[in-house]
Curated annotation (Swiss-Prot):
Record's keyword terms, sorted: Cytoplasm, Elongation factor, GTP-binding, Nucleotide-binding, Protein biosynthesis
All residue ranges annotated as the tr-type G domain in the record: 8-287
Protein name according to UniProt: Elongation factor G
Chain segments annotated as transmembrane: none
Organism of origin: Brucella anthropi (strain ATCC 49188 / DSM 6882 / CCUG 24695 / JCM 21032 / LMG 3331 / NBRC 15819 / NCTC 12168 / Alc 37)
Length: 694
């Protein structure tokens, strides 16, 4: 089977926005107009196609990015292939946005015409900057009360620090909104609002002609700056033709020099078709963006893979999903080469082979089996055993590791336990499945309490995972309050001489150990034996180490694991009959418990590296608040039009911070935090913790 669409006719793009900017409705309209959907699903009916998990339909927010393939016939009469990735707009799901931006070539940023640039728009925009993704802006909900296109254009400059390039102007606003002025063709496009209606092309209304002329002039001035020859011709009085103007806008958009701005209302079916034409005209094909970089596994040097079917096969797994019918599905973007069903591929990150069983083309929640896929395609693969998000799959003869995705460490953890014995086993399976799907979600077992601890990016993130466990895996669980992972250590040297003796008829137990315990700089446990002359026989020494290690998990102050301890065995004694590995294990355990007390045990707490990105107006409040949380400010710097505040803050004082920050900055500041190091807890705080846990 040969390639049906040339790679130049592909557009891989996503729609990104703040929660409630109308993203799902827009995707629905796109799917409708491109002929994939016969009935439009409205978000407020809970019947939308892209939001296919039950909770998304209930909450009316998009959580998982579903990938959809669809087709559009442009104004030139040529059919193009669109691969659309839907992304969530809630701050706890930024990981989903990151992973979808990673595999896109372009994006449409949706703005609510009334609210303009909202906090999550800023976050997502910054993430797109990081991956250098070309973007257009669509000002949606132009029919809403308070809709203001020109304010939105101004905010793209002032809030996002981006160059706005309006290619359309609205005709009317709020309930008077009728259509748009196309500034390239200088025509008015109006719609009667019925579903599927084509635009009526007419002359620009008299009262808007001057404004349209003024904005067209600005458009041309910005566009010709992209190309020296066009600039010279323009300065000499030659205007670019409409075709040349489109080519200049395309070039500037792909080079991320500016962002075309369009407008309309997806819900009322006005402005959707021109947006689809703009995707074709201004957003890049896979061949228009730089070739993906990677590391050649054989030579360990940097290499690139061109977007071509002839290049060796390379693809990136960007999402894993559990499908109720097919099981585990791995979504992957093919960057180069050709993929055939049944072939064996190398997972270069894991060093394992994977065989491609079923290969599917996804349409939101329906699917079709395919035999072959090509460079530029986004496919879903069934039956992969080892592959997780961010892994590279490639031709085993030409192995490469593509740029890896970076995932933040979880910042909040809660204890979770099954409600019944029957839920116990199901919970383990459910949590492992969810962790395989979502790299920002971790599961571990707390050895002291026997509880299962889950960790994630925020409270909503964990809420939804617990909820999914209930629905998809039918597991009922009790959830605890968020917790901090404290540690313990020692502050000075202590020498302990301990004898373990037990005699009760028959063979007894005997072991004597002399051990020096001292702190060291690392976090790990170091054991050393300085026994000479056989005072402790060689075969018993591993028992001494094992005994100490077995009690390192629970320190003397509040039962937290111990860090940074060195133990040196310097002397001991044994009995020919009564000594054993077990006896030395018991002796060293008791020696450690005594030694930890004498060596000045102390509590340690996790210190987080916190970065707050805030508009200038709130810097003082942000710094004051971080100081009140026992934070230490390490510096501030300007980033675009925002200020970045860096600080080290104890995790214990960061719970509920997101809500504080939102109210302090009217929702305009965001923060990220990750674990940095452990530090001794101040005495007053340590006493509180000991009371609570001892």
């Amino acid at each position: 089977m040969a390639r049906e669409y040339k790679i130049e006719d592909y557009r891989n793009f996503g729609i990104m926005a703040h929660i409630d900017a109308g993203k799902t409705t827009m995707t629905e309209r796109i799917l409708f107009y491109t002929g994939k959907n016969h009935k439009i699903g409205e978000t407020h009916d809970g019947a939308s196609t892209m939001d296919w998990m039950e909770q998304e339909q209930e909450r009316g927010i998009t959580i998982t990015s579903a990938a959809t393939t669809t087709f559009w016939q442009g104004q030139d009469g040529k059919k193009r292939r669109f691969n659309i990735i839907d992304t969530p707009g809630h701050v706890d799901f930024t990981i989903e946005v990151e992973r979808s931006l990673r595999v896109l070539d372009g994006a449409i940023a949706l703005l609510d015409a009334n609210a303009g640039v909202e906090p999550q728009t800023e976050t997502v925009w910054r993430q797109a900057e990081k991956y250098h993704v070309p973007r257009m802006v669509f000002v949606n909900k132009m029919d809403k009360i308070g809709a203001d296109f020109y304010r939105c254009v101004e905010m793209v400059g002032s809030r996002l620090g981006a160059v706005a390039l309006p290619v359309q102007l609205p005709i009317g606003a709020e309930n008077e909104f009728e259509g748009v002025i196309d500034l390239i063709e200088m025509k008015a496009l109006t719609w009667d609002g019925t579903i599927g209606a084509a635009a009526t092309v007419g002359e620009i209304p008299e009262h808007l002609k001057d404004q349209a002329e003024e904005y067209r002039e600005k458009l041309i001035e910005l566009a010709v700056e992209i190309d020296e020859a066009a600039m010279e011709a323009y300065l000499e009085g030659t205007m670019p033709t409409n075709e040349q103007l489109r080519a200049l806008i395309r070039k500037g958009t792909i080079e991320v020099k500016f962002h075309p701005i369009l407008c309309g209302t997806a819900f009322k079916n006005r402005g959707v078709q021109p947006l689809l034409d703009a995707v074709v005209e201004f957003l890049p094909a896979p061949t228009d963006v730089p070739a993906i970089k990677g590391i050649d596994v054989k030579t360990e040097t940097e290499t690139t893979r061109e977007s071509s079917d002839e290049a060796p096969l390379s693809m990136l797994a960007f999402k894993i999903m559990n499908d109720p019918f097919v099981g585990s599905l791995t979504f992957a973007r093919i960057y180069s080469g050709k993929l055939t069903k049944g072939v064996s591929l190398e997972n270069t990150v894991k060093g394992k082979r994977e065989r491609i069983g079923r290969m599917l083309q996804m349409h939101s929640n329906s699917r079709e089996d395919i035999e072959e896929a090509f460079a530029g395609d986004i496919v879903a693969l069934a039956g992969l055993k080892e592959t997780t998000t961010g892994d590279t799959l490639c031709d085993p003869l030409k192995p490469v590791i593509l740029e890896r995705m970076e995932f933040p460490d979880p910042v909040i953890e809660i204890a979770i336990e099954p409600k019944t014995k029957a839920d116990q086993e199901k919970m383990g399976i459910a949590l492992n499945r969810l962790a395989a799907e979502d790299p920002s979600f971790r599961v571990k077992s707390d050895e002291e309490s026997g509880q299962t601890i889950i960790a994630g990016m925020g409270e909503l993130h964990l809420d939804i995972l617990v909820d999914r466990m209930k629905r998809e895996f039918k597991v009922e669980a009790n959830v605890g309050a968020p917790q901090v992972a404290y540690r313990e250590s020692i502050t000075r040297q202590a020498e302990i001489d301990y004898t373990h003796k037990k005699q009760s008829g028959g063979s007894g137990q005997f072991a004597r150990v002399k051990i020096i315990f001292e702190p060291h700089d690392g976090d790990d446990f170091i054991f050393e034996s300085k026994i000479v002359g056989g005072s402790v026989p060689k075969e018993y020494i591993p028992g001494v180490q094992k005994g100490i290690e077995s009690v390192m998990g629970a320190g003397p102050l509040a039962g937290f694991p111990m860090l940074g301890v060195k133990a040196t065995l310097i002397d001991g004694a044994y009995h020919d009959v009564d000594s054993s590995v077990l006896a030395f294990e018991i002796a060293s355990r008791a020696a450690f418990r005594e030694g930890a007390q004498k060596a000045g045990a102390q509590l340690l707490e996790p210190i987080m590296k916190v970065e707050v990105v805030t508009p200038e107006d709130y810097v003082g409040d942000v710094i004051g608040d971080l100081n009140s949380r026992r934070g230490q400010i390490s510096g501030t710097e300007a980033r675009g039009i925002a200020t970045v505040v860096n600080a080290n803050v104890p995790l214990a004082n960061m719970f509920g911070y997101v809500n504080n920050l939102r109210s302090m900055s009217q929702g305009r500041a965001q923060y990220t935090m990750q674990f940095d190091h452990y530090e001794p807890v101040p005495t007053a705080v340590a006493q509180e913790i000991q009371k609570k846990f001892a």
